[in-house]
Amino acid sequence: MHIYVDADACPVIGIVERIAKSHNIAVTLLCDTNHYLTSDYSEVVYVGAGADAVDFKLISLCEKGDLVVTQDYGVAAMALSKGAYAIHQSGKWYTNENIDFMLILLYHIFRQNNFYFEVSVYETS
């Protein structure tokens, strides 16, 4: 088992490290280059700045049985699809039974607030 932390603005890094250290579990903190993290225990991986660069790097690293700490429902869904465990920084577990509801709820909140994602149109010439 390995613990991967979506470390951009994650307030529980110290707690994760303390628990992981007591169980001798490796931890990797992933953040973009706009943040600076140091750790005596965890490996820190910097990913180039980009909309979802950290998220995709984290998902490329995690494997079945690993633990992902994230507040991003999309990252949690992708981790679950790989057979990893996913937990919110507040302690709520993401599961295959609740992730669909959480994603749909988020979608409705965005729509209710008139938030729409921009769609790129590529010209073919």
PLM features per residue range, with description:
Residues 2-125:
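Nuclease catalytic cores that cleave nucleic-acid phosphodiester bonds
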